[in-house]
UniProtKB/Swiss-Prot annotation:
PROSITE patterns: ARGININOSUCCIN_SYN_1, ARGININOSUCCIN_SYN_2
Protein's UniProt name: Argininosuccinate synthase
Residues the entry annotates as binding ATP: A9, Y10, S11, G12, G13, L14, D15, T16, S17, G116
Keyword hit for Amino-acid biosynthesis: yes
Binding positions (L-aspartate): T118, N122, D123
Subunit structure: Homotetramer.
Gene: argG
Organism whose genome encodes this protein: Lactococcus lactis subsp. cremoris (strain MG1363)
């Protein structure tokens, strides 16, 4: 009887490379699976390295389009920002990665899935809750959480077992990156008084180094999702990639956040999210043009709930599914074009138009072209204020 098969979420870094050897020693045949969600890594290198360190099979899946359309798409439709600051960069990718891990496990006949998360962060929760939501029968193993090694011990184990040490191991920061942005933590950032050194950034210029002239872009939306950039029809993941480059050049999207983690601690996180910040602002601006007042006022309440659900690893919870269905209904009118000014760290919508626009210049103008019936205001004010007036008559004695 052969070894049991396990699918490992493989990144090519030290932790998951050591995990291949560690799991092999535990009696597993390791199938390494790497999901490309736009982190810009050399996937051929990762594929080959997995085999080099002992995986019996290496699988690389291009998930950029699905990640953009389904997961980032929901974030855009919902204007999702955890604690009104963090656009859910890592949190959005975890359920997709978990979904693909389960798919590979079922296709390969694996009985377990492994990930490289520590026991201190949010991602362990996101992965394991998602996996058990999709395949309760699968065992989940977290080698890094189990072995409790210091970094020096891990390096010693790697050297003893012929596991290559990554060239960037001396990088003091912990980095996670995908299409929607880049998360930076650890190192000097663990002291919340310290500013983030410029060498930690990759996607964005500093405001000081950003161009001294503004740049203008136009984003076209259809039912809440971008479909064109500067008049060119593109796939959503292509639009995001291009806006990351353009807005990042102008220093847009740097976020310094003291974050309340799911596991109960506060963490200090830096994010680079040029496309996320730019497209979220454009999307919200178009909603302001096309939503009735009641929807514009109510939707943010549910947006906050949905952001919390996704941050907390509950993408596959029925509540999340219901709220995303609500978002889809609201977005039917969010069609049009938004013009955005990019300059010195700011993405500012400066123009918008839509066939679903509820703005009427004839009603809003103060010129002779005004069609608003101002005489009707007298009766409206009387009825609108009637409850307050009655309360005053009864209680102000």
């Amino acid at each position: 009887m052969g070894n049991k098969k396990i699918v490992l979420a493989y990144s090519g870094g030290l932790d998951t490379s050591v995990a291949v050897k560690w799991l092999t020693d535990k009696g597993f045949d390791v199938i390494a699976a790497c999901m490309d969600v736009g982190e810009g890594k050399d996937l051929n290198f990762i594929h080959d390295k997995a085999l080099q360190v002992g995986a019996v099979e290496s699988v690389v899946l291009d998930c950029k389009a699905e990640f953009a359309e389904i997961f980032v798409g929901a974030a855009l439709k919902g204007n999702l920002m955890y604690e009104n600051k963090y656009p859910l960069v890592s949190a959005l990718s975890r359920p997709l990665i978990a979904k693909k891990l389960v798919k590979v496990a079922k296709e390969k006949g694996a009985t377990a899935i492994a990930h490289g998360c520590t026991g201190k962060g949010n991602d362990q929760v996101r992965f394991e809750v998602a996996i058990h939501s999709l395949a309760p029968e699968l065992e989940v193993i977290a080698p890094v959480r189990e072995w409790h090694w210091a970094r020096e011990e891990e390096i010693e184990y790697a050297n003893q077992n012929g596991v290559p040490i990554p060239a960037d191991l001396d990088n003091p920061y912990s980095i996670d990156m995908n299409l929607w942005g880049r998360a930076i933590e650890a190192g000097v950032l663990e002291n919340p008084w310290n500013t983030c050194p410029e060498d930690a950034f990759f996607m964005t210029n500093s405001v000081e180094d950003a161009p001294n002239e503004p740049e203008f872009i136009e984003v076209e939306f259809k039912e809440g999702l971008p479909i064109a950039l500067n008049g060119k029809i593109m796939e959503l993941h292509e639009i995001i990639k291009e806006v990351n480059i353009i807005a990042g050049k102008h220093g847009v999207g740097r976020i310094d956040h003291i974050e309340n983690r799911l596991v109960g601690i506060k963490s200090r996180e830096f994010y680079e999210c040029p496309a996320a910040i730019t497209l979220l602002k454009a999307h919200k601006d178009l909603e302001d043009l096309t939503f009735v007042r009641e929807l514009a006022h109510f939707k943010p309440v549910l947006e906050n709930e949905l952001a919390n659900l996704i941050y907390n690893g509950l993408w596959f919870n029925p509540a999340t599914k219901a709220l995303i269905a609500y978002l889809d209904e609201t977005q039917k009118v969010v069609n049009g074009i938004v013009r955005i000014k990019l300059y010195k760290g700011l993405a500012t919508p400066i123009g918008r138009k839509s066939t679903n626009s509820l703005y009427s210049e004839k009603l809003a103008t103060y010129t002779a072209a005004d069609e608003f019936d101002q005489a009707a205001a007298v009766g409206f004010i009387k009825l609108w204020g009637l409850p307050t007036q009655v309360n005053a008559q009864v209680n102000l004695k």
